[in-house]
Amino acid sequence: MNKEFDTLQMQAIEAHDGKYLVLAPPGCGKTEILAERIARALDRGVKPEEMLCLTFTNRASRGMLNRVCERLEAKRNELDIFIGNLHRYCSIYLINNEVIPENAYILDDDDQTEIISDLNSTLVHYRTGNINRNAINYISGLATYIDQRRMGHPESVLPSGPGVLDTKSGDFLTRDFSYFYDIAGRYNFDPQLIPSQHQALTCALQYSAYKKSHTALDFADLLVLAYDHMVTHTDHIRYSWIQIDEVQDLNRLQLAIADELTAPGATAMYLGDEQQAIFSFMGAKLSNLDILRKRCHGHVLTLSSNYRAPSYLLDVCNTYAEQVLGVSPEILPRAVRDEPHRPLDLILTESDDPEKEAMRIEGMVDYYLKLDTAGKERMAILVSCNAQADTISEALTAAGKSNFKISGTDMFRSKAYKTLTALYSVIVNDFDMGAWTRLLYGLGCLRTQIATRDKVHAMRSLMLTPSDLLRHKPYIRQVYELYTGGEAVVFDTETTGLNVLEDDIVQIAAFKIRNGKKVAGSDFNIILHTDRELPEMLGDLPNPLIAEYASRPHMDRAEGLRLFLDYTGSLPLIGHNITYDYLMLRNNCARELQEDVTFTTFDTLSLAKLVAPELKKYTLASLVDTFGLQGENAHLADADIEATLSLLDHCMAQAAGVLRAQEQFIANRSTQLIAARLGKIAPLRSNITSYLHLPVSVTGRTIADDLAFTCRTLTEQGLIDEIGPKFDIFLRYVQSEWVQRDSPGTLFDQVSAHIRDLTVSINEGDLVNSDELITDRLFIMTVHKAKGLQFDNVVVLGVNDGTYPYFTADNVLRSPYSTTEMKQRARAQIKEDARKLYVAISRAGKRLCLSYTRVRQYGYLAGMSPFLHSVSHLFHTGRRS
C-alpha cells in the first residue's frame, strides 16, 4: 500500500457487500480512498467489467483514473473499468445498445444556443446582440420535459422550471412545464398550431423537431434516452460494484440512471458533501442525500480528518459550517495540521465600492506573492460572475501581472480550437457530421453554423461527405464505376487479435469480381501458421477459427503472404472495415517479407454509412440482417467475403439512383466555393493521413506534437485565429496526461482514444491542477469553477450583502406579492448562496482574504455579507479605502 489511511478512511476503503454513503468534507482524502477501493476490489477478485465509477466532472474522473493507474502501475488504456461522468457513460451506452446512430451529432451548449436563438430571434437583443441565456435554458428544459412526458417517465425524474419568458415584458411568468405540456397536447405537439402567445412552447417543439431531422442530440437527450432504454429493457447491463462521487450535484434523473445501473445486491458507495451543493441551477437536488441516508441506513460514514488545511483555516470553515450551514459540530472534520498562524493569514477587508475594491487587487496580489519567497505558491481570486473575472484579469494583465483566468470565454469553446479539433475528428471518422459542420464553419466555408449544418445534412442525403469535395470523384461513384466496369478483389482476414502492429494473420480468403459479378474459379482461401495463441472467444461467441485452424493444413507465413500478393497483383481490394484488414496485411508483409505493400482499397462499411446513415449499427452481421441479404458474418474469412459481396451489390443498387443528383450538387456554384475553401487544408489533411496508422515509435510524432504542428500550419495559412498562450499549456497537458499515461500505439490510436476529450469534455479548469503545466501563480475564476481546486492563497471578492445571499432572494421574501412556492425557492437559494461561500473559503490552503464593499454596483447599499457575522472575529480587519 502506498499510503497510510486513518480508521474512518479504512472503513470506507474496505466497505463492501452493501450500500454505503460517505460524507467527505474538503481535504479528507476522498480521491485516494476512491482509488484504493478500486485496487482492493480488483485484489478481491471483482472483475473490471463488473465495476463502474461515476463522477460529476471530467476533471474528477481524470484525477481518479490517474490515481488508480499509479496505484496499479498500469497504463490508462490498459484499465478496463469505466471511470467518467454520467453523460459520457450514457453516450457509450446508447451507441452500444443501438439506441442512437454511432455518428449522431451531439450538440454542445453553443450549438444549442445558436439553434434556439435562430428559432426565436426575440432571444437576441436587437442592439447589443446579447443572448437571453435564461430563456435558452428554459426552452431546452421545456423540450426535455415534453419528451419525458411523452415517454411516460415518472414525475420524480422530470425537470422543473421557474417560469417562461414573457417576450413583451422580458419577465418570467410562474407557469409550470406541465401547463405548456397540456397546451401542446391539445395540438398534437404541432408547433405551427400553438397559439402565438406561447412562443417558448413553440420554440421548444421546433427545437425538438430540428434535432430529430438532423439526427442531433443535446446533453439532456443522452440522459433521457439512456434512462428510457433502461426502464423499458430490464435486461440491460448492471454492475455488481459501483461508486458514485459528488452525489449532491446529481439531479434526480441522474440518480435514477445510477440506480438502474446498480445490480441487485451490489456493493454501492455514494460519496458527497452537502456543504458543497452549489449546482441547483443545473438541476442538482440536495435532497438526494436524504434519499441516500435512508437507503444506506447503518452504513453512513463521515470522514473526520482534514489533511489539507491548517487548523486556523479549518476553524473558519467549521465555525461557518456550524453557525451558517447548521452542521452538527460532532461531524465536523479535525485538522491534522495544527499550525500557528500570523494575524494577516486571515484578512477581512472593506472598500467603499467595487471600483475601490478593484483598485486594491493589485496590492493584494503583490502582498501574497511577496510572502512566497520560494516562488511555488499559487493564488486565486474568486468572484461571483464571469464578467467580473474578465475585467479583473484584463486589469492585472495590463499591470504586467501574468494570470490564468477561467471564465465564460473558455479556450476550448473558441472557434479556432473547435476548427482544429474538428479536423482530427473527420480524419479518424469521415462520417462525423457534427465535426464536419464545425470544420466547414470554422474555415469560413459558410457564414453561420445553421447554414453549414443544413449543407452537411443535404450532402448526407445524397450519399456524400465533405471529403468527396476533395476527391476527383465522390467515393461512392468511384466504387460504382469499378463495380460496373472493372475488376477487384473482395477479401477478408482472420487474425490472432486486434493489434494491427503486432498480431498475426491466420486466414486469408478472397475472390475476384468483374463487372459486378464474381469470377468463377477465383476463390482463394489459405491458413497461415502462427505461434501466437488464438483467442477462445470473440465477444460472447466461441471463436470458430480455432476449429478451422486445427482441421486444415498451415502454410508458411512468408509463402502464404507472397501467394496472396501474386494472386492480387495490382487490383483494388474491397472488404468490410477494410482499414483493419489492410493494415494487418501491410504490417504482416513488412514483418515476414520486409516489403511495404500498397493497394487501392474500398470499404463496404463506408458504403453502408453513405447509403444508410441513420442506422444504429454497421457490423457485417447486422447489415446482412437489416437489408435482408444473402450470406452470414461467420467470423471465418471465406464465409464473410460472400456476405461482403452481397452488401456491395445492395449498396451499388442504392447508389445508382443518386449519382446524377450528386453531380448536380457538386457542380453548384455554392458547393464549388465550399470545395475551394476546404481545399486549402487538403495538403495538411493528406499529410496527417499518410502517417496516421504508423507506430508513434517510428514517426516520433505524438498527438501533442501533431496538434502543435497542425495548429501552427492553420494559423500561418490564416485559416484560424491564434488560439492563445493557453494552448501551449494544453499541449503539455496532452503530453503528460494522455501520451505518457497511455501505451503508445499509432497517432490514430491516440486520437481515437481521446477524441471526446479533445472535442467535448475538456475545459480550462482541467489544466489548473498541475504546477508542472502552468507557470502562472495567479488564477482568476468564479466560485463554481473553483470547486474541486485548491490554492495556497485565496482572495474572495464581493462578499457583500446582496451577493451572498443574492439580493433577488431577499426581495422575494420581502414582497407581499410572493407566493409560498416563490418564497420556498428564495429560501433554498439563500441556503445555496451560503454553501457557495463555504466552497470559496474552503479553497484556501494557507491564507484567506475576504473582501466586501459598503455599496455594490449602481450605488445600492451593500456591506458585509450576513453569512460572515459568525466568523468575522477570526479575521484581521483590513483598512477601508
Which residues does each predicted region cover?
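Conserved helicase NTPase motor core
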Residues: 2-14, 18-23, 60, 82, ...
